[in-house]
Amino acid sequence: MTTPDLTGALFEIVARTAGRRPGGDAIALSPDMVVLERPRNRDHGDWATNIAMRIAKPLGESPRTIAADIAKALGELPQVAKVDVAGPGFINITLEAAAAGALAHTIVESGPAYGRGHSLEGIRINLEFVSANPTGPIHLGGVRWAAVGDSLARILQAEGADVTREYYFNDHGSQIDRFARSLLASHLGEETPEDGYGGAYIGEIAERVVEGYEGDIDALTREAQQEVFRKSGTELMFGEIKQKLHDFGVDFDVFFHEDSLHESGAVDRAIARLTELGHVFEEDGAIWLRTTTFGDDRDRVVIRSTGEPAYISGDLGYYLDKRERGFEQNIIMLGADHHGYVGRMMAMVEAFGDTPGVNLQILIGQMVNLLRDGEPVRMSKRAGTIVTLDDLVDAVGVDAGRYALVRSSADQNLDIDLAVLGKRTNDNPVFYVQYAHARTCAVDRNAAASGVDRSAFAPELLTHPTESALLGLLQEFPRIVAQAAELREPHRVARYVEELAGSYHRWYDSCRVVPRGDEEVTDLHRTRLWLNDAVRQVVANGLNLVGVSAPERM
């Protein structure tokens, strides 16, 4: 019996129970009100719910009385072994062994689809992440967003959302000016400009620009030279960024140029729309947006008195452009230095008549520190002053790098110790999880060699405590995925597969799939092979959601 099966049956029972009572019609019952949770003490059953306490007040009866009626009806379900009412009205549910064990068959038959849901079915989501300007290799903070953002996109898609991965960048701003001046200075053998970019990559890009230029670049004026380095240098740097991200397993559907906002008229349309809504005013020759109406600490200049657009004008045009493209939900991932950006963005959303936190969410990520044996890693020789994606991948590989960046909440500072990630021991979390998958595959190979197959399935035989614990965790996977999608927290999936791996290793040490010596193959062995393969599938599904491979051998 799967969690959705039990939840659906419980909802029907609750609806009937409420409907038989005065005031029952006044309760707006919905399936999402019925929540099943794992009891902390497994002696209290497989599942628990507090639904009786949630509906007791409008029904005018005690929670325990309502819980008793619900428990009686639940106890009549053939898959339920026992139902108890505890405390003020908790309902504890114990499933029949066969009903609990049947999940293994369901998972194997479902394959990659197990864990997927429908909570975001049909919703169009724009997920903007990384969005670094092409002035150098991606630093470790951007790499964190690459791993977290791609994982979040996978999880949102697993819940049915139509997700567009988007990368926003400006190839004509002041950072690009500094980048172009740095390239030109490198070519001319001059000192790096005071506000320029250093590192060996500047010389490499400058050389490639010169090699690719058709003609004598030194015959150009300095201004013309700088324009060549600006255009070709940013194209080369951005091409490198795209390739490095692709090699890291991160690809984007849309690369959005800031300039296109002005060229397409999106900024003008946004200002016109906000003017119609009465939120724009003129003062001191400038055009302002009255964001204080919506909780911002001050009103914001949109068009300066010089006629030049202020920074927020691009935000206005970009948000309107996304809404015009049909995105109901927009998620932006930003670094810790953008914390002050949130208030004005949410005020902007409200000024458009939308709902902050629904139509726009902003996720703020914290710093990443790279260590080796507890000591800070030296900066990249190529990038000069930052630790880059290449540094991480060269040290530990794509899988370990991605997993390390995803397994912790993005709003917390993160220390990654390369020495730990290089170990083939249980101290290394990615090894621990991948080894669990490889072990399930080894069990399959050994089972085949010993004549154990899945020709029989007797779930009532899966009664060992480690089997009950393992089945309980397997039941949790769809809920974990849905929760990770709702809360925008991919680390929940990573932590779940770690817990599942630990439970599997304990089961492996206690329960044999392959018979010893001359021992005959029994239905218990065959049924345990189903359970082994169910774990293999769920570990693979979980790792796929965070963009990490599931090796068959290690």
Swiss-Prot record:
The keyword Aminoacyl-tRNA synthetase applies. GO terms for cellular component: cytoplasm. Keywords: Aminoacyl-tRNA synthetase, ATP-binding, Cytoplasm, Ligase, Nucleotide-binding, Protein biosynthesis. SMART domains: Arg_tRNA_synt_N (SM01016), DALR_1 (SM00836). It catalyses: tRNA(Arg) + L-arginine + ATP = L-arginyl-tRNA(Arg) + AMP + diphosphate. InterPro entries: aa-tRNA-synth_I_CS, Arg-tRNA-ligase, Arg-tRNA-synth_N, Arg-tRNA-synth_N_sf, ArgRS_core, DALR_anticod-bd, Rossmann-like_a/b/a_fold, tRNAsynth_Ia_anticodon-bd. It is found in: Cytoplasm. Belongs to the class-I aminoacyl-tRNA synthetase family. NCBIfam families: argS (TIGR00456). Monomer. This is Arginine--tRNA ligase.
